[in-house]
């Protein structure tokens, strides 16, 4: 019986990926004009004719827009979008806008912060309040898919070693690169940081590895949809992924990325959600809240969001997340005993040492919810038990799922205003 369930789940995965692979070339390489980041590529292709929608949205709200390319120490090229100041402000103004980073979560990109209208969008609310806003991206999503050596690390090739990364590399390479670049460009010694989901997890991991860097670089920290660990996560999606070992399927397909679909696939998802928004809502609710409808996201607008989501990631990253759930350890990537001994000199990978958080002195604000199956108070204790609560405030929200923190208009009054007050209280503006 277990074998049949595993086979059925595996066949479904194969069917989905068959559709994906059919839209690639015979070599497994994506057509550059309809790549895994098709929406972004489309806007880039037509950039000279019409400003991209995200740039237009920012400009229409009354702000300048900039795009920056950031090189990591291991050769990945990340994209960051900047909202530096109002259009009405002189270029050589003496006004200093303190920088703040907004870092997306798993399967996501910087698009996610801009899907609401300007009056409900966190980055534009922050910009209106006087901040220099940076929407950063981690490697391998729809916005950051470049490498300085594209011959050997070709993101358009679904089999490429470009995709050999997980949240560990995002924490060790991407986050420091983004922070250092923004400090250099703005001239500020410290920046503030807002992370959603994985965006908060990589912050914690970097602190566990290099606490001095974070203490010297971060002024204030905010986490929404906070995930410190997923040892007891109630997400049916995580539980299914951990229960049904998909590694044999993935190894057979030899495909290394996940949800990095091309334009055809995005079109299918978008049209499906447009004509069947109720079914689409049910699927999304299953993913982000185990089927519970919090009624915070407009289902009629949901289909629009799938022009820009999911943002994509690597299979190795997903595997690393599932290892955390199955092994009940927040540790480095588990390659198996033989390779672990070679890399770590141990049968099992070392855990990230959160005991260093006992010396954590950065003012922090964290949000969790009773309707978020990816996060709960029990798992949060893996972090908070180490923290001096003098520096940390935890907000327990009711009836917010994992995406409501980003895509619900209710978040403006329930969360974003509180974030502004927190930042102002800690002298960021």
Model-derived regions: residue spans:
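N-terminal cap/lid segment of alpha/beta-hydrolase-fold proteins
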Residues: 54-87
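Alpha/beta-hydrolase active-site loop
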Residues: 162-183
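Alpha/beta-hydrolase-fold enzymes
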Residues: 26-33, 184-189, 200-344
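Short beta-strand/loop motif that positions the catalytic acidic residue
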Residues: 360, 366-368
């Amino acid at each position: 019986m277990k074998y049949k369930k595993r086979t059925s789940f595996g066949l479904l995965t194969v069917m989905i990926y068959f559709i994906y692979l059919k839209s690639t070339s015979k070599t497994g390489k994506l057509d550059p004009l309809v790549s895994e980041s098709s929406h972004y590529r489309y806007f880039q292709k037509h950039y000279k004719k019409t400003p991209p929608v995200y740039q237009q949205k920012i400009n229409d709200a009354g702000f300048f827009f900039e795009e920056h390319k950031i090189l990591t120490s291991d050769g990945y090229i990340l994209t960051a979008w900047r909202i530096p100041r109002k259009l009405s402000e002189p270029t050589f103004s003496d006004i200093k806008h303190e920088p703040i980073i907004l870092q997306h979560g798993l399967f996501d990109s910087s698009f996610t912060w801009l899907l609401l209208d300007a009056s409900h969008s966190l980055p534009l609310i922050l910009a209106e309040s006087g901040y220099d806003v940076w929407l950063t991206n981690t490697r391998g999503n729809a916005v950051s898919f470049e490498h300085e050596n594209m011959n050997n690390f070709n993101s358009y090739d679904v089999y490429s070693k470009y995709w050999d990364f997980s949240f560990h590399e995002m924490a060790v390479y991407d986050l420091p690169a983004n922070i250092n670049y923004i400090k250099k460009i703005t001239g500020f010694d410290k920046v503030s940081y807002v992370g959603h989901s994985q965006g908060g997890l990589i912050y914690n991991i970097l602190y566990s590895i290099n606490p001095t860097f974070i203490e010297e670089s971060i002024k204030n920290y905010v986490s929404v949809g906070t995930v410190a660990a997923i040892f007891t996560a109630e997400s049916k999606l995580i539980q299914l992924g951990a229960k049904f070992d998909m590694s044999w399927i993935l190894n057979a397909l030899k495909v290394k990325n996940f949800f990095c679909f091309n334009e055809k696939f995005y079109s299918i998802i978008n049209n499906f959600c447009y004509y069947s928004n109720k079914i689409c809502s049910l699927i999304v609710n299953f993913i982000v809240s185990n089927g519970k409808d919090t009624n915070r996201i407009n289902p009629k607008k949901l289909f629009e969001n799938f022009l820009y989501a999911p943002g994509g990631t690597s299979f190795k990253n997903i595997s690393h997340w599932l290892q955390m759930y199955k092994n009940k350890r927040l540790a480095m990537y588990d390659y198996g005993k033989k390779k672990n001994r070679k890399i770590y000199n141990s049968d099992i990978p070392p855990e990230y040492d959160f005991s260093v958080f006992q010396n954590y002195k950065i003012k922090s604000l964290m949000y969790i919810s009773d309707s978020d199956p990816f996060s709960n108070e029990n798992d949060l204790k893996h972090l908070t038990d180490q923290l001096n609560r003098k520096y940390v405030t935890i907000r327990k929200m009711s009836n917010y799922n994992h995406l409501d923190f980003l895509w619900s208009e209710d978040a403006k009054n329930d969360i974003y205003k509180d974030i502004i007050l927190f930042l102002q209280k800690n002298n960021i503006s």
